[in-house]
Amino acid sequence: MCSTPGGKWHIVSGRTQEHVAPYMAVGLSTVVHGIGSRQDIERNLRIVEDGIHAAVSIIGINMPVRLIALAEGALTGFTDEIFDIPHVTAARDLFIDIPGPETDRLAALARQYDTYIVAQCKARWPEVIDKRFFNTLFVISRQGEIVHKAAKNHLWCRERSCVPHDVYDRWVELFGDGIDAFYPVLRTDDIGNIGTICCSDGEYPEAVRALAFNGAEVVYRPSEAVPMTQMGMEPGGTWLLQNRAHAHFNNVYMVCPNVGPVYVHPRMEHPYDIAGGNSHIVDYQGNVLGHTASGANTFVAGIIDIEALRQFRTMNLNSNWMKDLRTEIFRRMYSEPVHPKNLWLNADPLQHADVDEIYRENIGRLVARGSFTPPAQAFPGARYIAPSESPEDADWAQVRALWPEPAEE
């Protein structure tokens, strides 16, 4: 089956499920080179290809590899976020279409190794809205077909991707307003039901719960800047803590590859490890199956047993928590908005400093409602500090000069 936002699933009562054989899932952590044009993605693709060849050769001797997961940024990096490039400019000059030549390369690998590939990439979605890009999650089948496509729904404060909520009315017009419109799940007969979120999405318990309600059994959550979100003494910091909790509360597997060190631009002598490694795979009870401390061109692997998960969910009278939910008592909790919708439906997305003010207004709403209690004394809060040569739209050429001129096509 193919899943896209708003896709409907038809369940046949009493149907006997086919047995899903255990399989190996692999998460890649690859070194990333920032891109100055779409052509620069080629370099990252070569690194990903080498990583897939190596990982399958090494881990495939244990059990068939049926799911390979790439980290966030593995293809397109983070140029737009780091340099605060205007959204429309980044959509035009940097990002891809799905399907396209880049996904065709991954499709060839999926066919070669008889595996699904799940990945993230910033991509245009013109059938939704023009001159925008979305942080997009997609799955390629063993036959090399794109069978799932979803958008990231929550951003950290320095990401300027468009999300469905930013163009809410248009999104609902196309896909409806059900859970499946925002958290579609890919249902397969050979690797289980796959849900996808990305990085900041996982800071909200509702995201994985929505996928679980929609049938997800394996959830892909790539990348987190672990040092930024509190590392602490435990490997993986709060990122691993969150993913173990997601797995435990929802009885899902979590497949979580972290991005490797990043060369922001070609003139950097050394890459910067912005994410801190600690890729992991967690089982449906919250146990860590695989953990890799390093993030520098390596991988994490773990065995996924869908049949065991299904038995656990349906035989259990205790720790399959979703069965106990009293949904009516939570219904009004979200009746009042926090973040405004449709911000970029009729206006171009703003840059970092201006968006900071939107977040401050959100904080103000929570204070006004009594959700947040203000401190006794107010101090200046976090703010955007521009680099010495902050690029406005007219200065994109100056930033672009950090990269060699792309070859003529």
Model-derived features: where do they sit?
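C-terminal beta-strand edge segments of enzyme domains
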Residues: C2-I11, Y253, N258-E409
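Beta-strand-turn-beta hairpins that frame and shape the catalytic cleft
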Residues: G14-G27, P184-G195
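Active-site catalytic loop in hydrolytic enzyme cores
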Residues: A108, W125-A245
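CN hydrolase (nitrilase-like) catalytic-core segments centered on the catalytic cysteine
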Residues: I98-V118, N193, C199-V300, L402-E408
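Short beta-strand scaffold segments in enzyme catalytic cores
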Residues: A119-C121, N135-V139, P184-L186, S279-I281, ...
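A short acidic, glycine-rich active-site loop
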Residues: T89-D104, D169-F175, L240
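Metal-dependent catalytic neighborhoods of phosphoester/phosphodiester hydrolases
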Residues: A74-R92, V128-F133
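A short, N-terminal amphipathic alpha-helix
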Residues: V48-N62, L106
